[in-house]
Amino acid sequence: MLSHVVGATSPPLIEGTIGEALAAAARTWPDVEALVSVAQNLRLTYAELLARVDALACGFLRLGLEPGDRIAIWSPNKAEWTLTQYAAARCGLILVTINPAYQAAELDYTLNKVGVRALVAAEAFKASRYCEMTEALAPEIAASTPGRLRTARVPSLEMVIQIDGT
């Protein structure tokens, strides 16, 4: 008996990574709109998106994140979410998506369960005050040196990156 199901083998799987696919799209359609956020009054072409993604990916690496590290995003749908997703892919980080409806206890569980090293979080969304919940979970944030957070409740968490809300 087979332990797995054999599916269709045609068409073949696409080779490459998500980050490589974005770079290929930017080469093929540099001036075509790739990301539109009406709520943020933002429109980016593939070339502009790739430039912002690569700048963010470089920023993640300069902060000391390394390929294989877990970076979480806790935010409603906004441009920064997409930028974070692609930037994580471009520099080999593992993206952990946190439900924007989660409260502090669920955030605590999620961050600890998967060993998140960095958290990218919006300031707030609807009634959820992400910054306040994060500070309650890791009160050491206020006195920590940027990039050197040490928190008792989430030992793996070293950095919190706040999305400014615009």
Each PLM stretch: what is its role?
Residues 63, 91-166:
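Structural core segment of the AMP-binding/adenylate-forming
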Residues 11, 42, 46, 97, ...:
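Flexible, glycine- and charge-enriched loops at secondary-structure boundaries
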Residues 32-33, 69, 132, 158:
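Extracytoplasmic/periplasmic beta-strand context in beta-sandwich domains
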Residues 14, 34-86, 103-108:
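Conserved AMP-binding/adenylate-forming core of the ANL superfamily
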